[in-house]
């Protein structure tokens, strides 16, 4: 088993979970800042937004998780703040971040669809990297299996939990997000085929479909009325994206890159 603590500095400990999130964040900011000028924004617009949105998104992700696990946290109130042990719900962070984005764009007089298109591939890459935080914490896994011989030994060893090998759903989602990121980056090189909102719509459909399937493999999902919460959200986001694409193309929306 890999030590979840990357290193210690006196009484302070830096967990691999945090390292994965921070690496994903830095790469996401770099990619978004690089793309911003092509959408008539500045890198400062991106950085200022991140400084506001990131801490709020972490808080939102934690609140989302705690809310659906309140039966546990109501009896262990001190654990609510122990985010280094895991328990950050991605959808909670995305919902919070999106709300902050619309408020930020309103006050900065920026186009929120432009901002979402810029953010989508960056977020997808950050999610691909961030999922490895679940690997180090031994969470977000699936049912017990007899062997995982198709995986490298370090993953097999880390996925040996409670006396059994576990389906590495974190890895499936990480790879799914990475593939989606590559598709967007290639697609973005052909702007004539793109309209404003196509990138964020693709993200919602791609991530939503992947999460819908992979979530069904997990054994530690947040539940609501006997169904996994993330599956509810995934279906909703897929429907929203499909409706948005249909309306946008029917109305012959604005091209992704404007001269």
UniProtKB/Swiss-Prot annotation:
GO MF annotation, one: phosphatidylglycerol-prolipoprotein diacylglyceryl transferase activity
Any one Gene Ontology BP term: lipoprotein biosynthetic process
GO CC term (a single one): plasma membrane
Chief place where the protein resides: membrane
Bilayer-crossing regions: 12-32, 46-66, 83-103, 109-129, 167-187, 194-214, 226-246
Enzyme Commission no: 2.5.1.145
InterPro entries for this protein: Lgt
Pathway assigned in UniProt: Protein modification; lipoprotein biosynthesis (diacylglyceryl transfer)
Binding locations of a 1,2-diacyl-sn-glycero-3-phospho-(1'-sn-glycerol): 131
Membrane topology: Multi-pass membrane protein
Keyword line: Cell membrane, Membrane, Transferase, Transmembrane, Transmembrane helix
Subcellular location per the Swiss-Prot or TrEMBL entry: Cell membrane
Top-rank taxon, per record: Bacteria
Function: Catalyzes the transfer of the diacylglyceryl group from phosphatidylglycerol to the sulfhydryl group of the N-terminal cysteine of a prolipoprotein, the first step in the formation of mature lipoproteins.
Alphabetized PANTHER family for the sequence: PHOSPHATIDYLGLYCEROL--PROLIPOPROTEIN DIACYLGLYCERYL TRANSFERASE, PROLIPOPROTEIN DIACYLGLYCERYL TRANSFERASE
Family as reported in the entry's similarity comment: Belongs to the Lgt family.
Record's protein name: Phosphatidylglycerol--prolipoprotein diacylglyceryl transferase
Gene: lgt
């Amino acid at each position: 088993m890999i030590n979840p603590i990357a290193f210690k500095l006196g009484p302070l400990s830096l967990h691999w979970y945090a390292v994965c999130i921070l690496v994903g964040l830095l790469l996401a900011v770099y990619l978004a800042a690089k793309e911003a000028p092509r959408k008539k924004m500045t890198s400062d617009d991106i950085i200022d937004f991140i400084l506001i949105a990131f801490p709020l998104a972490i808080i939102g992700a934690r609140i989302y998780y705690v809310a659906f696990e309140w039966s546990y946290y109501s009896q262990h109130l001190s654990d609510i703040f122990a985010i280094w042990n895991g328990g950050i719900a991605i959808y909670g962070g995305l919902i919070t971040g999106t709300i902050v984005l619309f408020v930020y764009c309103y006050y900065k007089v920026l186009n929120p669809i432009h901002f979402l298109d810029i953010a989508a591939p960056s977020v997808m890459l950050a999610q691909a990297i961030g999922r490895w935080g679940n690997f180090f914490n031994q969470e977000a896994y699936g049912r017990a299996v007899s062997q995982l011989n198709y995986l490298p030994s370090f993953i097999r060893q880390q996925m040996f939990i409670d006396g059994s090998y576990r389906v590495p759903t974190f890895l499936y989602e990480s790879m799914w997000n990475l593939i989606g990121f590559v598709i967007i980056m290639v697609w973005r090189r052909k702007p004539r085929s793109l309209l404003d909102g196509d990138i964020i719509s693709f993200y919602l459909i791609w991530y939503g479909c992947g999460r819908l399937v992979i979530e069904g493999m997990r054994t530690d999902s947040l539940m609501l009325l006997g169904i996994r919460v993330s599956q509810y959200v995934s279906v909703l986001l897929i429907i929203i994206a499909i409706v948005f694409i249909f309306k946008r193309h029917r109305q012959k929306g604005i091209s992704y890159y404007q001269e």
